[in-house]
């Protein structure tokens, strides 16, 4: 599970669409067939869909995409992409151009049962370097309307970045005692980051 279910809560409260066309912020893209299908997924991800056919000889698709201002990272490979630039790259069938901006905090569930909408006990937190950020993780049972009665969880995650030093603070889970997991395991993954000389937890 990616963070789509968790992101939806934030956008329901604010009224801002979870998926926004890229041309909302870059109007010139609307008239450019190469980039007009790009869109933002939540506040942290940019998706650049591949719509062209794959070259059957190379087993690759040549794809052109535009990265907006700032520093962005390929969500799959972690490769760094400076912004405000046009790019051309080959993609394999299993690849997909999704980019996370610097400072993104992406929560993922490690469970293999994708049909299970319950609150996970194991979470992987992927962090992309470069900018300090704060993310609030929202969770409910994913099935009932009990969240209206306050049966949901919130976890604040703070990422403080200062050159080669960075700190991550995962604050205590807020929520009614009946749904707070007895134990939660976090796996921290720092993308495009050199191996740390020292780690303190």
Can you annotate each of these PLM segments?
Residues 4-197:
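Catalytic core of carbohydrate-active enzymes
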């Amino acid at each position: 599970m990616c963070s789509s279910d968790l992101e939806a809560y934030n956008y329901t409260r604010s009224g801002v669409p979870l998926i926004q066309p890229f041309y909302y912020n870059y109007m010139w893209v609307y008239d450019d067939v190469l980039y007009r299908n790009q869109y933002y997924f939540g506040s942290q991800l940019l998706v650049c869909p591949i719509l062209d056919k794959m070259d059957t000889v190379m087993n690759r698709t040549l794809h052109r995409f535009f990265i907006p201002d700032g520093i962005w990272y390929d969500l799959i490979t972690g490769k760094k992409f400076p912004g405000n630039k046009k790019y051309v790259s080959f993609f394999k069938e299993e690849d997909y151009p999704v980019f996370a901006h610097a400072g993104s905090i992406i929560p993922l569930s490690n469970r293999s049962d994708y049909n299970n909408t319950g609150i996970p006990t194991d979470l992987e937190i992927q962090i992309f370097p470069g900018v300090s950020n704060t993310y609030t993780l929202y969770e409910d049972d994913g099935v009932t309307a009990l969240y209206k009665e306050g049966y949901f969880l919130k976890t604040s995650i703070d990422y403080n970045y200062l050159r080669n030093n960075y700190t991550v603070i995962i604050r205590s889970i807020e929520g009614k005692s009946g749904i707070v997991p007895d134990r939660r395991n976090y796996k921290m993954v720092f993308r495009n980051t050199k191996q740390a000389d020292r780690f303190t937890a």
